[in-house]
Each structure stands twice: as structure tokens, then as C-alpha cells.
């Protein structure tokens, strides 16, 4: 049976760069890897062909020989100065995976494993709701969640009795087995110890040898002053318990601050909209304003204040997290136009508008309409 062209196998042109070869092989190897296709002989054979093609094309000398002589360059006794077949593909393909995939396939020691074989517990996430006042003052929030916790009967070892575990005779403690198939090696997770490298002789009846059981956890979370929505609180070791005494994961608590009826927040600064009467905006005066700390502050409104003007109260905002500083509070003025006026009130306003100095009293609107009039005259005269 003739062998497939290496370039065609990987879907490459003969001018492919090493980066393109690696990318193509990675894509195809992920699809046909034996760990992803257990028991599929066709996938296993395809994987062998892909690995052979990669081994040749990624090597400068082997690729040059292949480009010149084709598959015959690697035949026994080719007589063309080519490579011996058996020595030409001596690569351990687990090295290829470590290079291309970062050791992510099962069969190597995964990053989720600790050195002595136990699987580290997963990190957990929990969302809580707090008020803006809780964020200002700091608070403690009771939480509860269900996860794997360390088994109390065996203290997490998974074993009953003095002998905790013995080395797996199949993988000899490595957690994986290697099978030589022709010119390369396939590495798989040991099916006897499931990659742990150890076997428990007398399993704990409560946890069935896992060293952990499902249970409810109740904690009191300390929420620091100044925390914002999107921040996270990390509780070390409060996540899922590790397998057979391995390290537990962490718990991440994400606070969500409820919408406040008065304030909006931007970082450590607080903002609020305050409607004031037209007469107050015109003549100036004072208003009493509540702060997030529960105190009241007398705030001066300048004479001639306009709609949208902002008044700043220094250090009346939120605490800066892990600091003694505070943000500011900004009051945005909304000048309220009077409604439901009496006839007498309307006459007074008309009389005021007819006063000769109203141009100076309303410089923005007067100036605007003068510009409009000038613009219109320019159009008519053009």
C-alpha cells in the first residue's frame, strides 16, 4: 500500500514554513489523538501517519531528503544517502506534544496534578449582593455553598488503617504508561491507578478512597471598605478539596453592589442629581445634602447657577480600597422650571422679561438667538 504524501496529509504546500507545519500538525493531532478517540483504530493509524509526517517535515535535513527522494529516502538500504527508517523516526512524540501543546494531553503530568500524585481541587466562584453602604463601611457577609470537602473519617488520605497506599505495579508510580508502536511511543494515563501512581489497599468507606465528600460549607466573608462591583475576594484553600489530601482550590467571592436610590458611583467618586428652584439658582443660597457616611452638609449654591453645573464636596465620596483616602462627591444641579403658575405669577414673569436689562440677565440665550438671526440674514443676502 502506497504511503500518503506528507504535505497532503497536513494540508500544506511544499513551501510551508516551520510555523505553518506546527500549526497544521497541532490542528490535526488534536483531532486524531488516541486519548480523544479511545478504541478507534482508524484514528490511531491516522495519528501515526500525521506524527511521522511532522517528524520529517519539521526537521531541515529530513525534509530536504524527502523533497528530493520522497518516501524512498527513508527506506532500508536506499543507497541514496538517505535516512535509515528505524533511526530516522526515533523521536518520542510526547516531546512533540510538550513543545506544541504545553503538556496539556493526559499522559504527561498535568498542571492540575501535584508532585505526589493527588489532583488539586478546583477553584470556585460565588456571587453576593451588597449595598453601597456596605461597601462604604465594610461588612461581613455569611455565605454557604456545597462542594467537596476533606473526608473527616480518613483525614483526606482515602485510606483506612496505617498503610495509606502502595505504588501502582502497572505504571511503577509514574501515573502513565508508554506503548512502543513501531517507530514512536504513545503515552497514556495508567488505567489501573487513573494517573495517580498509587493504589489504596483499604479504601475509606465514607469517601470510597477519594479523600473527600460532598458537604455544605458555611463561612463569614469579610468585605473590605471601598470594594466595587467586579472586584473579587480570594479565600485561600476554601474551594474544592483536593483528591486524596492534595491541595484545595480557592474560593473567589464577587460582590455586586445594588443600585442606590440617590447616588451613582464612578471609582471612589459619588454623583447625584439635585433639582433646585429657579429662584435659588438665580439668587444663590444653600441646600442641605446627605452624605454616604450618614452626615448632612450645608452646600452653597452660587448665584446664577445653570442647569448641569456641578458642585464638588471634597472627600465625601467612597473610601479608596486599602487606603485612608476618600473620593469626592459631585452634585449636579437641575434647575426646575416652574409649572402651574397663577395669573399673577405669569404677569410678574412677563414684566420681568420686558425689563430693559434682560439681555444682561440671559447672556447665553440672547447671544444664541443673535447668532441665529445673523446666520439667517447671511443666507438671505447670498
UniProtKB/Swiss-Prot annotation:
Protein name as catalogued: Chaperone protein DnaJ
Gene Ontology terms: biological process: chaperone cofactor-dependent protein refolding; DNA replication; protein refolding; response to heat
Zinc finger (CR-type) in chain: 138-216
PANTHER family listed in its UniProt record: CHAPERONE PROTEIN DNAJ (PTHR43096:SF48), DNAJ HOMOLOG 1, MITOCHONDRIAL-RELATED (PTHR43096)
Domain observations: The J domain is necessary and sufficient to stimulate DnaK ATPase activity. Zinc center 1 plays an important role in the autonomous, DnaK-independent chaperone activity of DnaJ. Zinc center 2 is essential for interaction with DnaK and for DnaJ activity.
Domain J: 5-70
Chaperone in keyword set: yes
GO molecular function: ATP binding; heat shock protein binding; unfolded protein binding; zinc ion binding
Binding locations of Zn(2+) 2: 168, 171, 190, 193
SUPFAM superfamilies according to UniProt: Chaperone J-domain, DnaJ/Hsp40 cysteine-rich domain, HSP40/DnaJ peptide-binding domain
Disulfide bonds: none
Binding site residues for Zn(2+) 1: 151, 154, 204, 207
Organism of derivation: Ehrlichia ruminantium (strain Gardel)
GO cellular component: cytoplasm
NCBIfam families hit by this protein: DnaJ_bact (TIGR02349), PRK10767.1 (NF008035)
Cellular localization per UniProt: Cytoplasm
Cofactor note: Binds 2 Zn(2+) ions per monomer.
Amino acid at each position: 500500500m502506497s504511503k500518503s504524501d506528507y504535505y497532503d496529509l497536513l494540508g500544506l504546500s511544499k513551501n510551508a514554513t516551520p510555523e505553518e507545519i506546527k500549526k497544521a500538525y497541532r490542528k490535526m493531532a488534536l483531532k486524531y489523538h488516541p486519548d480523544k478517540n479511545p478504541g478507534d483504530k482508524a484514528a490511531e493509524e491516522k495519528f501515526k501517519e500525521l506524527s511521522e509526517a511532522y517528524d520529517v517535515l519539521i526537521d531541515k535535513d529530513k525534509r530536504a531528503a524527502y523533497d528530493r527522494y520522497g518516501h524512498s529516502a527513508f527506506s532500508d538500504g536506499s543507497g541514496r544517502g538517505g535516512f535509515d527508517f528505524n533511526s530516522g523516526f526515533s523521536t518520542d512524540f510526547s516531546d512533540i506534544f510538550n513543545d506544541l501543546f504545553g503538556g496539556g494531553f493526559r499522559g504527561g503530568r498535568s498542571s492540575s496534578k501535584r508532585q505526589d500524585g493527588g489532583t488539586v481541587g478546583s477553584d470556585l466562584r460565588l456571587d453576593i449582593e451588597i449595598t453601597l453602604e456596605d461597601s462604604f463601611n465594610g461588612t461581613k457577609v455569611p455565605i454557604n455553598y456545597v462542594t467537596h470537602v476533606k473526608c473527616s473519617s480518613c483525614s483526606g488520605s482515602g485510606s483506612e488503617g496505617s498503610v495509606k497506599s502502595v505504588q501502582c505495579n502497572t505504571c511503577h508510580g509514574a501515573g502513565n504508561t508508554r506503548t512502543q508502536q513501531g517507530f514512536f511511543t504513545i503515552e497514556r494515563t495508567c488505567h489501573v491507578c487513573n494517573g495517580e501512581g498509587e493504589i489504596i489497599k483499604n479504601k475509606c468507606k465514607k469517601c470510597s478512597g477519594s479523600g473527600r465528600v460532598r458537604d455544605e460549607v458555611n463561612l463569614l466573608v469579610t468585605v473590605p471598605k471601598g470594594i466595587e462591583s467586579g472586584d473579587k475576594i480570594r479565600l485561600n484553600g476554601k474551594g474544592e478539596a483536593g483528591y486524596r489530601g492534595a491541595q484545595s482550590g480557592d474560593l473567589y467571592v464577587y460582590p455586586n453592589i445594588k443600585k442606590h436610590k440617590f447616588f451613582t458611583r464612578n471609582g471612589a467618586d459619588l454623583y447625584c442629581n439635585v433639582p433646585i428652584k429657579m429662584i435659588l439658582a438665580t439668587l444663590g443660597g444653600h441646600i442641605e445634602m446627605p452624605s454616604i457616611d450618614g452626615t448632612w452638609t450645608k452646600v452653597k449654591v452660587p448665584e446664577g447657577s445653570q442647569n448641569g453645573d456641578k458642585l464638588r464636596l471634597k472627600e465625601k465620596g467612597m473610601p479608596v480600597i486599602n487606603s485612608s483616602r476618600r473620593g469626592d462627591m459631585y452634585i449636579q444641579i437641575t434647575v426646575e422650571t416652574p409649572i402651574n403658575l397663577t395669573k399673577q405669577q405669569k404677569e410678574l414673569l412677563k414684566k420681568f422679561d420686558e425689563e430693559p436689562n434682560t439681555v444682561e440677565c440671559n447672556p447665553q440665550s440672547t447671544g444664541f438667538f443673535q447668532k441665529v438671526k445673523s446666520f439667517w440674514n447671511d443666507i438671505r443676502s447670498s
